[in-house]
Regions:
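Glycine/serine-rich phosphate-binding loop and adjoining beta1-alpha1 elements at the start
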Residues: 1-36
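A structured beta-alpha segment of the ubiquitous adenosine-cofactor-binding alpha/beta core
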Residues: 96-130
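Beta-sheet entry/capping signal
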Residues: 1, 36-37, 63-65, 109, ...
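Glycine-rich phosphate-binding loop and adjoining beta1-alpha1-beta2 segment
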Residues: 65-105
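A short acidic (Asp/Glu
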Residues: 48-52, 75-80, 122-124
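Phosphate/oxyanion-binding active-site loops and adjacent basic polyanion-contact surfaces
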Residues: 12-16, 41-46, 84-95
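Generic recognition of flexible, low-complexity loop/linker segments
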Residues: 24-28, 53-54, 119-122
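Glycine-rich adenosine-cofactor-binding loop
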Residues: 28-61, 68-73
Length: 131
């Protein structure tokens, strides 16, 4: 016999790809699936952009490259997506970690660059849909 009553738990299967496609407009039914995306700068605006782009498919089936050489500092907390937990980390790595922990997204296609090089940008200009 159990000492406590049995509690029923509701379970639900989550399909991130379906959840991304569900709310996209008809003129762009695939969102950023299969699109290579380069995001340079992960400050107050760039951090929120990375989060939003992930939620519409960036990096699910193609590359999503995050570029920022700066470290996240305590003075950034009031205006940034990241919180105190990430202070002292490089922004690109911290954003990648945040997205891995806070979305259904499997971060297999993420690449993190701490420096922007002319060569990197040139190579992406030839094959990237969104910069």
């Amino acid at each position: 016999m159990l000492d406590e009553p049995v509690q029923f738990v509701h379970t639900q299967q989550l399909d991130f790809k379906k959840s991304v496609l569900r709310y996209l407009p008809a003129q762009s039914p695939q969102g950023l699936l299969n699109k290579k995306v380069l995001l340079v700068g992960l400050g107050a605006i760039g951090g929120y952009m990375a989060d939003a782009l992930t939620k519409i498919g960036a990096g699910i089936e193609s590359d999503f490259v995050l570029v920022d050489k700066d470290q996240f500092l305590a003075e950034n907390v009031s205006r940034h997506l990241l919180g105190l937990l990430y202070c002292g980390q490089f922004k690109a790595s911290a954003i990648k970690q945040h997205l891995a922990e806070n979305t259904f997204f499997q971060q297999k296609k993420f690449d993190v660059k701490l420096k922007t090089s002319h060569h990197l940008i040139q190579s992406f200009l030839r094959k990237t849909i969104l910069i």
